[in-house]
C-alpha cells in the first residue's frame, strides 16, 4: 500500500513538473505580446515593426515541429527533454544580452526550436507518466499550466518588464527553466520513445478527413484570435487611450478567464465537445467584432476580455482533445502537426495584425480578425455535422 501511494505521488510529481514546463514554454511564447511597446522603445522602432517577431517565432515552430519530431523520434525522452531545456535556457540568456533587434530575433528562433520539440511530445509523456486511470486529469494539468501562462505568466512578465526592463523578463524565464530542468533530471525515469509515429504515419493521418478538417479549423480560428490579440497591448494604450497598468490588468483578466473555460470544458467536454467548440468560436466572433466599440470604456473592455478568454481556452482544449482522439496510434506526429498548424495560425494572425496596423489602422484589428472567425464558425458547424461520431470517438 505504501509503495503504491509513494508511486502515485511520484507519478503526480512528474506530471506537475511537466505542467510547470508547459507554463514556462507558453509564457515565453505569449510574453512578447505584453512587451511590444517596451521592446520597440528600446530599439527605437515602431510597435508594429517589432510585432513581426511574433510571426517569425510562430512560423519557425510551425516549420520545424514535424521535422524535429521525426529526427528525434527514436531518442530517449528524458535525454531529449534535458537537451531541449539547455537550448531553451541558453537562448533566453541571449535574449537578455541582445544588443540589437536582430540578435533578439535570433535568440527567439533558438527558443522556437526547443518549443517545436517540446509540444510535440508533452501530451503523450503526460499520459505515460500519469497514475493508472488518471490520464484525463494529467492532460488537464498540462492544460492548466498552459492557462496559467496567460493568467500569471504573461501579466507577471509584463510587470517585470515595466519595472525592471523587458530583458529581465526573459532572464527570469531562463532562471525558471533552469529550476524546472533540475527537477526533471531528479524526477524523470528513462523514457524510451513509444508510439511516436514516423514518416509512414503521415499518409495514414492525411487519409483521415475528420483530422484534416480539425487542422484546417485550428489554423483559421487561431489566425482570427491572434490578428487582434497580438496587438492588444498597444491597442489598449494607443487606440483606447487607457494606461499601461490597465493593459496589464486586461491581460490578467483575459488569461484568468481561461481558467473558467478550462473548468467548463472539464465538466461538459466529454459529452458536448463539438457544441462547446462551435459556441466558443461564435463567442470569439462576437468579441472581435465588439473590440473597437468596447474601447470607449474600461468596464466594457474588461467584460469583453472575460468572454474572449473563456472562448479561446475552450477552443484550444477542444482542438487538442479531438486531435488526440483521432490519432491514438501516432500521437507525437499528430501533435507535432497540430503544434505546427497552431503556430501557422499564430504567425498568420500576428502578420495580419502587423499589416493592418502599419497600412490601415490598429483600431481595425478586431473587425479584420472577425472575418476568419466567421469562416471558422461556418466550417465548425459543417464538419461537426458531417463527422458527429468520428470526432467524439477514437479511430483505429
From Swiss-Prot:
Q: What is this protein called?
A: Probable sugar efflux transporter
Localization (cell): Cell inner membrane
Q: Which GO terms describe its molecular function?
A: carbohydrate transmembrane transporter activity
Q: Name one Pfam family in it.
A: MFS_1
What PANTHER family does this protein map onto? PURINE EFFLUX PUMP PBUE, SUGAR EFFLUX TRANSPORTER
The organism's lineage? Bacteria, Pseudomonadati, Pseudomonadota, Gammaproteobacteria, Enterobacterales
**What's this protein's function?**
Involved in the efflux of sugars. The physiological role may be the reduction of the intracellular concentration of toxic sugars or sugar metabolites.
UniProt source species: Escherichia coli O6:H1 (strain CFT073 / ATCC 700928 / UPEC)
**Which regions span the lipid bilayer?**
15-35, 50-70, 81-101, 103-123, 136-156, 170-190, 209-229, 246-266, 275-295, 299-319, 333-353, 364-384
Q: Which InterPro entries match?
A: MFS, MFS_dom, MFS_Efflux_Transporters, MFS_trans_sf, Sugar_effux_transptr_put
